[in-house]
Amino acid sequence: MDSDSPILPLSNNPPAARTHDHSQRNNHARHVSSSGTTLFAPVKPATKKYNYRRVSPHGSYISPLEAMTVKLADTYSICNPKFQFSSEQNPRRPLTKPSEGVHNHGFDNVNHDYVLYVNDLLGTDEGRKYLILDTLGHGTFGQVARCQDLKTQQIVAIKVIKNKPAFYNQCVMEVSILELLNNKYDPEDKRHLIRLYDQFMHKNHLCLVFELLSINLYELIKQNQFRGLHLSLVRSFATQLLSCTSLLKQARIIHCDLKPENILLQDLSSPIVKVIDFGSACHERQTVYTYIQSRFYRSPEVILGLHYNCGIDMWSLGCILAELFLGLPLFPGNSEYNQLCRIVDMLGNPPTWMLEMGKNSKKYYNSGFVNGRKTYELKSIEQFSIENNKTEQPGKQYFGEKTLDAIVLNYPRRKTTPKLTPEEHEERLCFIDFIKQFLELNPLKRWTPDQAKNHPFITGASFSQYCIDKQKPLLTTQRTRNRSHTIGNQAVVPPSLQRASTYVSNEPEEFVHTRPLPQYYPPANENENVDEFF
């Protein structure tokens, strides 16, 4: 400190002479008042306070730390009045990998994805410009970015499609289906469907603007450490998803890819969900694709190569509801053959008419005649591996029990905890009966959404009385057929289900519709089946 710096007095009296007694000075200035009392004041330099020094844009003084960080541009403009800051001059961080421009005049990378940058803009028309904030995910179709509408300041999700004709054409179908559903069938946004706000072209990429939602149900299960959710929460999700699938059936639209990843929470404060990703959806009268649905949720008629309808979404929904309660997929097949094996092990063989008409039946089944009746037997893993020139793996078993009843009634595996109360036992029996209607192998007998809405699991009615009214036993014992079990031929073959005539897939099965499973089971906390997220 400068030795000539003045001392700030605490009174109107002149300051006393300086003392050289360092033991009493202690970095303070000593003053004597008129009454003879000695006073001390902090030593402060008298500096000229410029009006513009450390001043925020609103005129108040700010700390040096704030001035040199968040207010750095303002500080520099004070030092150099000619300096003008623009956010467009900020370094742009790439969000797309790889980020090197290869195609489309350098705008696209080697995978034909548009290279996204933070603070870059999507859209060029006035009133249709979106500031890129971050990335939300990517897939075979392209990328999803978190953006801000510069006109309304609303935060949205924008799906940027790859610059390839096949993806463009498929997304045009997605747009037409969503506009039909949003505008005609659900204009009031009450049926749990994602809302499409806008679509436009940007640098030869189709961009779809959606409402921004929260995490998906798979992430919810993962955050719950793969422990099942409480049945009351499963019931809430089931009610909403039945409302959605009922609307889809009314519009004769098949989603074709229902799974936990495509069901998102609206926000983290409530259990309201919405169904997303209609990129694989189609009209019931235009079912040209046969390689559809994610494997864990793929219906038997799709595996066998039969014609399909909205019933395949109900099969997927049954698998999803079981997974929400159990914490793990009910049929986690590691291949399509293994997927079929898991289904047959738990539910038995499909009806003979399905095996007779399935385009892929010969791939999975041996056929023959016993006493003049045609029979079918699922091929062994050894035979299937030899015939298809690949090594099939049996797949890990995540449940100790094999029947659906036993899996649900005994989950979680209890060691020291008491048995289920009668009320809990009946509630689980009700849930078992409910999802069995979704997991009906025969698509002609599988329940529709409107039928499922009237089940006691949804309505809350007495399940015991329901069983009496339906003349069914309260405690059902599900029979599990052996995979080599033969089924007698049926006389009537439903004409509405015909062989699918087209196979469209340009990607190997192992690269799509897969998801890693946790390496452990049962989960760490095996004595509780509660949801800790809400």
From Swiss-Prot:
Location of the active site: D257
Reaction catalysis annotation: L-seryl-[protein] + ATP = O-phospho-L-seryl-[protein] + ADP + H(+); L-threonyl-[protein] + ATP = O-phospho-L-threonyl-[protein] + ADP + H(+)
Swiss-Prot/TrEMBL keywords: ATP-binding, Cytoplasm, Cytoskeleton, Kinase, Nucleotide-binding, Phosphoprotein, Serine/threonine-protein kinase, Transferase
Family the UniProt entry places it in: Belongs to the protein kinase superfamily. Ser/Thr protein kinase family.
Stretches assigned to the Protein kinase domain: 130-458
Gene Ontology BP, a term: signaling
Residues reported in the UniProt entry to bind ATP: L136, G137, H138, G139, T140, F141, G142, Q143, V144, K159
Keyword Transferase in annotation: yes
Main subcellular location of this protein, as a coarse class: cytoplasm
SUPFAM superfamilies given in the database record: Protein kinase-like (PK-like)
Protein name: Serine/threonine-protein kinase ppk15
SMART domains per record: S_TKc (SM00220)
Sequence segments annotated as region (Disordered): 1-40, 85-104
GO molecular function: ATP binding; protein serine kinase activity; protein serine/threonine kinase activity; protein tyrosine kinase activity
Positions where Phosphotyrosine occurs in the chain: Y291
Modified residues (Phosphoserine): S33, S56, S60
Signal peptide start and end residues: none
Protein's cellular compartments: Cytoplasm; Cytoplasm, Cytoskeleton, Microtubule organizing center, Spindle pole body
Highest taxon above the source species: Eukaryota
